[in-house]
């Protein structure tokens, strides 16, 4: 710690910080542009000037840039010094000479750091009367709009895109006051994290194009704290709504998880919530048609049919909340509850959970991954299956430069010096996968092989680290030399990290990862292990347990069950569509509860229209076992009284109560959570994931809307001039209104949107943190359900045999895509142009045997259908395998590991 003196007052601060960080952490306001907590200091904009004095007696002082000055013990500075204030105002005036007067039409208006800093410096009159510099804007793809005339040359965008996210297609061109930030030519930004430019940019150069189509100001949107639903990582988000539509998603700061950044799937993939074909009222089949029901009719009709059924089973979902899956389990009984996950995937999920809970190895939070100094990724294409983890891995690799700089006593915020010292130095990263990955550019070595051979590599590494681990026979000398390099790197690391998961389709890969981690722990390393699952609540469903989807289908096929309730699950993704359809056709009652229109609704007798994450509350559990709560953003029935969309748990509990002819006793979310805790002790921690509905701050609920929210009385004027009462939230501590507490100093960690007096942009998160870039002042949201066990597991011994190609047979190797493999975000219209066209990847040798080239169309039979796809040649794919894009174009993820036998060139 250090003692600094600011405008005559004494403060204790972190001596490792610079003065700008220290003052912002104290709650003092200093304007800045080029500095960002995640990017460090370069002193480019000169906006954060303060007056520094030699001692208490010095009255003259000198101007210094606070972002480039250490917060040393005994420092005396003044923020309010007149010369410093005039200098800061003049800097803004210089920046404004070429900045357009377009705040009223700029999409950044009201959410703009430049506006905030201009007001903060007191600059209110422009003296520049000459021609402004102008630029041509670029088309940067479907996600981001580009308006270069608003640029103030702070360099944040390229520092984030190139230095932080390792992007290669955005740069700065030109010189002096005529610089251009963009691509060499028009085209879609290639980085999976390009959307963060929207929040990194302090002006309106980069804005959210998906928001442009249905634009409104930040102060006119309704927000709620939420969790990204598009993968298992559980990033915190702030969805914004207006007129019953999601308009945009912003990053919600969580110092333990995603801190300042999201991936593009999480930021832009929300379009499925706004689809017009979503079920909005319950419907029941009458012959070949469906009739619309109200809620009471739906409950009575379903109850009447279920009473006549001899056995009702329930099929849950890894994309449904803990509460909804539990409500289904209560409806049908624990013994009749099935997870809706394929048997193989469920085995892998249970193994991953076993490793995390009983393996004795620490599981780091997402942000902690950045602190590891050697990383081994076994089997996961992390950028496609858990993209935000990939960004954290990139920071871990860069830690070598910080380590070298620290040895020379260079502060962690001196980013330019760190980059100069580090040059190309990296901590070691080793990646195994069936083919190329997006992390290969920073990897020390990439091993491209079938999953058996990847697992064998992992087992061999574990044995080399600890000879009591099972040995692997038949390792080639060339591969052994690579294993020796990996072992040396992992053994020499202080904090090695092993990453694996369920998406490779191999139990042995997960076992090998666990063995490597155990071997490293035995050598005294502070080792971590991260498992990546498939869906937002895969871990929660795994903890809850239940039978596999195949077992559920068998119950229907044999007639032992004659009614089935399917919860938020497109079963065609987890099993053969032919088998699913045949099994459902045998059931007298098929009830579907979902917020998306799926193929299995064609087999449904009753459809209950569920609420999506934006219209409901619930709990999900991420890949590290962290329970996190998402909250309802808006009530769709407020805008259309005919809409009947309820949380899935509400539908299911209401049906359960109707069946038993009793009053509904789960009248609010807390009642469901209490029931979960009582029945499933392993999930007891979810009660602490967020405060209950009685939580108040000075007697107030928390506001979902900014206090400047406008137009509420006119929203429904086209329907009726009589304004209805605002929706009443009985489930949470939030209110559907601007009336409520929204102060940054209030004792809360569930924050709907970032705003503080004088801070309207995302930089307002500074006001919610215990120190800038640290944790939220009153704790980061969420709670870990399990910590590192004391004992640990024995070594796994099932070393697989080497992969052997078979004549006339090809095994399907899974290829995942950030844009397209996820069940929900692939429905977003904006993603359609980012999704790759369907393909089949072939090794060059296999292509030669078949007599086909790139672009040739080949066909194969699957599930009673003939599938025809164009060939792509994959040099890294081992012969005897074919690569298919999982989750796209009818290619269900369950296909991973299956075999094709009739692959041939398609008839023209």
Swiss-Prot record:
[4Fe-4S] cluster 3 binds at residues 228, 231, 235, 263. [2Fe-2S] cluster binds at residues 34, 45, 48, 67. One of its GO terms (molecular function) is metal ion binding. Transmembrane segments: none annotated. Residues 83-122 form the 4Fe-4S His(Cys)3-ligated-type domain. Binds 1 [2Fe-2S] cluster per subunit. Binds 3 [4Fe-4S] clusters per subunit. Its cofactor is [2Fe-2S] cluster; [4Fe-4S] cluster. Belongs to the complex I 75 kDa subunit family. PANTHER family: NADH-QUINONE OXIDOREDUCTASE SUBUNIT G, RESPIRATORY NITRATE REDUCTASE. This is NADH-quinone oxidoreductase subunit G.
């Amino acid at each position: 710690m250090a003692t600094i003196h600011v405008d005559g007052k004494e403060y204790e601060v972190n001596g490792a910080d610079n003065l700008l960080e220290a003052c912002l952490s104290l709650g003092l306001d200093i304007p800045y542009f080029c500095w960002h907590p995640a990017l460090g200091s370069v002193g480019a904009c000169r906006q954060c000037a303060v007056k520094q004095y030699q001692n208490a007696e010095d009255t003259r002082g000198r101007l210094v840039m606070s972002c480039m000055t250490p917060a040393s013990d005994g420092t005396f500075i003044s923020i309010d010094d007149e010369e410093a204030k005039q200098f800061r105002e003049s800097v803004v005036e210089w920046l404004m000479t070429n900045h357009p007067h377009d705040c009223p039409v700029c999409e950044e208006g009201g959410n703009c750091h430049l506006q905030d800093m201009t007001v903060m410096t007191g600059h209110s009159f422009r003296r520049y009367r000459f021609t402004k510099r102008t630029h041509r804007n670029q088309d940067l793809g479907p996600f981001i709009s580009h308006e270069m005339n608003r640029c103030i040359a702070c360099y944040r965008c390229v520092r984030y895109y190139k230095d932080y996210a390792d992007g290669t297609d955005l740069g700065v061109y030109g010189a002096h006051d005529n610089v251009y930030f963009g691509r060499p030519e028009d085209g879609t930004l290639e980085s999976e994290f390009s959307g963060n430019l929207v929040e990194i940019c302090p002006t309106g150069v980069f804005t959210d194009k998906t928001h442009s189509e249905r634009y409104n100001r930040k102060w006119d949107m309704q927000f709620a704290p939420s969790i990204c639903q598009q993968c298992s990582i559980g990033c915190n988000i702030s969805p914004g709504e207006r007129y019953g539509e999601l308009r945009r998603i912003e990053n919600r700061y969580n110092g333990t998880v995603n801190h300042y950044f999201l991936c593009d799937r999480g930021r832009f993939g929300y379009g499925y919530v706004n689809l017009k074909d979503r079920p909005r009222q319950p419907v029941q089949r009458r012959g070949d048609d469906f009739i619309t029901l109200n809620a009471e009719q739906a409950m009575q009709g379903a109850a009447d049919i279920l009473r006549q059924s001899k056995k009702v089973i329930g099929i849950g979902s890894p994309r449904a909340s803990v509460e909804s899956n539990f409500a289904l389990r209560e409806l049908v009984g624990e013994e009749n509850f099935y997870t809706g996950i394929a048997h193989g995937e469920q085995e892998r999920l249970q193994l991953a959970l076993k490793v995390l809970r009983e393996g004795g190895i620490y599981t780091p939070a997402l942000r902690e991954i950045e602190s590891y100094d050697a990383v081994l990724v076994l089997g996961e294409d992390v950028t496609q299956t858990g993209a935000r983890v990939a960004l954290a891995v990139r920071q871990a690799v860069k830690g070598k430069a910080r380590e070298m700089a620290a040895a020379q006593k260079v502060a962690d915020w001196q980013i330019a010096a760190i980059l100069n010292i580090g040059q190309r130095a990296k901590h070691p990263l080793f990646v195994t996968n069936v083919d190329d990955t997006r992390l290969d550019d920073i990897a020390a070595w990439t091993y491209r092989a079938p999953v058996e051979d990847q697992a064998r590599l992992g087992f061999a590494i574990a044995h080399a680290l600890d000879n009591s681990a099972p040995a692997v026979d038949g390792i080639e000398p060339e591969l052994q030399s690579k294993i020796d390099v990996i072992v040396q790197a992992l053994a020499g690391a202080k904090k090695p990290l092993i990453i694996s998961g369920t998406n490779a389709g191999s139990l042995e890969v997960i076992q090998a990862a666990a063995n490597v981690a155990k071997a490293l722990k035995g050598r005294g390393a502070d080792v971590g292990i991260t498992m990546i699952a498939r869906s937002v609540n895969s871990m929660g469903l795994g903890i809850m347990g239940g039978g596999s989807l195949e077992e559920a289908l068998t119950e229907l096929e044999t007639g032992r069950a004659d009614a089935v309730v399917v919860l938020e699950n497109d079963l065609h993704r987890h099993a053969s569509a032919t088998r699913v359809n045949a099994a459902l056709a045998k059931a007298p009652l098929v009830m579907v509860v979902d917020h998306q229109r799926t193929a299995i609704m064609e087999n449904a007798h009753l459809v209950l229209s569920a609420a999506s994450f934006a219209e409901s509350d619930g709990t999900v559990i991420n890949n590290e076992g962290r329970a996190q709560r998402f909250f309802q953003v808006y009530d769709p029935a407020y805008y259309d009284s005919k809409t009947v969309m309820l949380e899935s748990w509400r539908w299911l509990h209401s049906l359960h109560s109707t069946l038993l002819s009793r009053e509904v006793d789960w009248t609010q979310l807390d009642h469901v959570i209490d029931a979960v805790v009582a029945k499933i002790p392993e999930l007891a921690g979810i009660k602490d994931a967020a405060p209950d509905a009685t939580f108040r701050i000075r007697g107030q609920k928390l506001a979902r809307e900014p206090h400047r929210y406008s137009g509420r009385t006119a929203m429904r004027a086209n329907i009726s001039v009589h304004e209805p009462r605002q929706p009443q939230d009985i489930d949470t501590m939030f209110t559907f209104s601007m009336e409520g507490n929204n102060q940054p100093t209030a004792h809360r960690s569930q924050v709907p949107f970032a705003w503080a007096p004088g801070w309207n942009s995302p930089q307002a998160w500074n006001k919610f943190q215990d120190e800038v870039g640290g944790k939220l002042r009153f704790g980061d949201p969420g709670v870990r359900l399990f910590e590192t066990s004391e004992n640990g597991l024995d070594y796994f011994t099932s070393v697989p045999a080497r992969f052997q190609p078979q004549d006339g047979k090809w095994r399907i190797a899974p290829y995942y895509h950030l844009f397209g493999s996820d069940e929900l975000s692939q429905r977003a219209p904006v993603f359609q142009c980012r999704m790759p066209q369907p393909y089949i990847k072939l090794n060059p040798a296999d292509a030669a045997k078949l007599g086909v080239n790139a672009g040739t169309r080949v066909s194969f039979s699957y599930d009673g259908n003939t599938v025809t796809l164009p060939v792509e040649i994959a040099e890294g794919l081992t012969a005897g395998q074919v690569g298919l894009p999982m989750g796209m174009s009818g290619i269900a993820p369950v296909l991973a590991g299956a075999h094709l036998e009739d692959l041939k060139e398609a008839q023209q």
